[in-house]
Amino acid sequence: MRHILVTFAMCFLAISAYPGTYVETFDDGDFGDLDIYNYGGGISEWKVEDGILICRRPVSMTSTLLYGEENWGNYSIECDARIVEPIANLYSIGLDLRVSNIDNASSINDVWCLAGNQGVVYIWAWLNGNSAVQSPQKAFHLQLNRWYHLKAIANENEFEFYIDGELMASLSDSRFPSGRVGLAVTGSVSHLDNVVITGDDVPDNNVETAVSSSGKLATTWGQLRRQ
């Protein structure tokens, strides 16, 4: 986990402001017993080194590390992410919303929020294993080795994707009422850190795990000291 320059008081208020807030900083060297879904098959490698989650996905299809349950409704997810090394022709980082039916590729549903080397940011929804709808695209030049703060929101039929606090894409669709949530990597070696998930269905984890003895905040609120 990288340092975040805020006070303990700000940390506590930010985390306790929601009835359900899950924080993951990877400081324990593990990402737990989570499902990994590789869209289109192929391989991916997810591991934790030095308090940072690392994904290696060598093909131009997305690999997603999934949190939560399929009955999760409204929530937000945010994290810090950067692409360190492109591997495939198409590469991206992003977040995955309302993911369901991963046991059957022909019936999987999800809403991707992606930024990559295509020069645009967009939300792309898939229904029953097929492309269903895509948001208007917004121009965006993704820089390698630069940390970005990603945030995605699923609220009723509305989906929003933010990068560094700026709304980059939005989509309205009623066909994705609930589902799991995840971190998405395509065609690259990418780093991810400081995951925060909030929502009515999201279980709290211990606030004390979000703050080290030195008072460093382990979520993405506050000003990051970019490396």
Each language-model region and where it sits:
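Extracellular glycan-recognition regions
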Residues: Y18-R226
